């Protein structure tokens, strides 16, 4: 993993002795964003436990700062939306980027991607899988996958 870039808390009055350090998102999947290819992807597994905050989350409202600092969990902030997630070893992460002159509506794009995932997981024997909300996949009431995306410089990044 590349060296972490430190971000600062949104609360200038926060106590840094109990405040975990918030780093810019730099997990291995993000390296594909800079790839010269029109389309690129990453499939892998986290090498550690990470808490990843969505673009609009703030550290104070999203996590138990004292416990996160005590446990030494690395906290990252991704450039895409959505809520905070925990990543850990033995989880599958997949991401892709696509350059495009015409960026689709994100909701339509999530629906398209989720329908393709459901179709292909179904072929593998995974049943009762459906879209929940804008970007999640569930089996029954159990969420099994969440995703987010952002666009920058005519490039879509989905993870």
Regions found by a protein language model. Give the residues of each.
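A generic local secondary-structure boundary/capping motif
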Residues: 41, 63-65, 83-85, 146-153
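Short beta-strand-initiation
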Residues: 38-39, 80, 132, 144
């Amino acid at each position: 993993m590349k060296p972490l870039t430190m971000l600062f808390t949104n609360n200038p009055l926060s106590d840094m002795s109990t405040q975990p350090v918030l780093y810019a998102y730099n997990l291995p999947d993000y390296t594909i964003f800079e790839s010269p290819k029109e389309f690129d992807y990453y499939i892998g597994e986290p090498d550690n436990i990470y808490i990843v905050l969505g673009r609009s989350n703030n550290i104070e409202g999203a996590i138990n700062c004292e416990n996160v600092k005590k446990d030494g969990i690395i906290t990252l902030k991704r450039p895409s939306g959505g809520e905070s997630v925990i990543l850990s070893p033995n989880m599958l992460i997949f991401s892709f980027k696509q350059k495009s002159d015409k960026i689709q509506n994100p909701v339509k794009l999530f629906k398209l991607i989720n329908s393709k995932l459901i179709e292909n997981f179904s072929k593998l024997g995974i049943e009762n899988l459906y879209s929940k909300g804008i970007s999640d996949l569930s089996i029954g009431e159990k969420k099994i996958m969440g995703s987010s995306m952002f666009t920058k410089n005519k490039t879509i990044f989905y993870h």
